[in-house]
Design a protein with these regions (language model features):
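CheY-like receiver
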Residues: 3, 9-18, 140-175
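Alpha4 helix (beta4-alpha4-beta5 surface) of REC/receiver domains from two-component response regulators
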Residues: 39, 84, 97, 108-123, ...
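Acidic, metal-coordinating helix/loop segments flanking the phosphotransfer/catalytic sites
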Residues: 52-70
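Acidic catalytic/metal-coordinating carboxylates
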Residues: 55, 81-87
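Receiver (REC) domain active-site loop signature in two-component systems and cognate sites
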Residues: 77
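A Lys-centered signature of the CheY-like receiver
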Residues: 127
């Protein structure tokens, strides 16, 4: 599978390569099969950095520690309602509040869709998801961020992640 894909820009109709190797992801789903499937798709797109969490609590800890560029989450989790989880991620005081979120759910009512939109979700996908649909939704997020913020949230997150990695490397050197 090719590591670089192209997508269409809605602005000018031009194609541009989407470099998945520079985008990190956090997949949040209590179903191991779903996490493996999404991870496989992301690796197929060329992504190298994919984290997984089986619960909201684990995801919050991972998000704070790794600063992923995009979070892909289910709504139905054993430890916390998905909407509450999203609101915790998007709390204005949280450093992770600017991370784009894709909801990937097998059960999405109109009420739930309205709720997640109001909570600040960037994209909604219904399970089962195809690689094409996942790719298109990720591309839309990247395109929006690139158009909206010249130093994008992606760049800011990359800087934070580099600082975290540097700190971890320093901590390991002390051992």
């Amino acid at each position: 599978v090719a590591a670089a894909h192209t997508t269409r820009s809605s602005a000018g109709g031009h194609s541009f390569p989407l470099d998945f190797a520079s985008i990190s992801f956090l997949i949040v789903d209590d179903q191991p099969f779903t996490r493996r499937l999404v991870r496989s798709m992301l690796h197929g797109f060329g992504s190298r950095e994919v984290y997984e969490a089986a619960s909201a609590a684990e995801a919050l800890e991972l998000a704070r520690g790794t600063m992923p560029n995009i979070i892909i989450t289910d709504l139905m989790m054993p430890d916390l309602n998905g909407l509450k989880f999203i609101k915790m991620l998007k709390a204005p005081s949280a450093p992770i509040s600017r991370i784009p979120i894709i909801v990937l759910s097998g059960y999405l009512t109109k009420t739930a869709a309205l709720g997640v939109n109001e909570a600040g979700v960037d994209e909604l996908l219904v399970k089962p998801v195809s690689p094409k649909a996942l790719y298109e939704h990720i591309s839309r997020i990247v395109l929006r961020k690139d158009q909206a913020n010249p130093p994008t949230a992606f760049v800011q997150n990359q800087r934070r992640r580099a600082e975290l990695h540097k700190k971890k490397a320093g901590d390991l050197a002390l051992l």
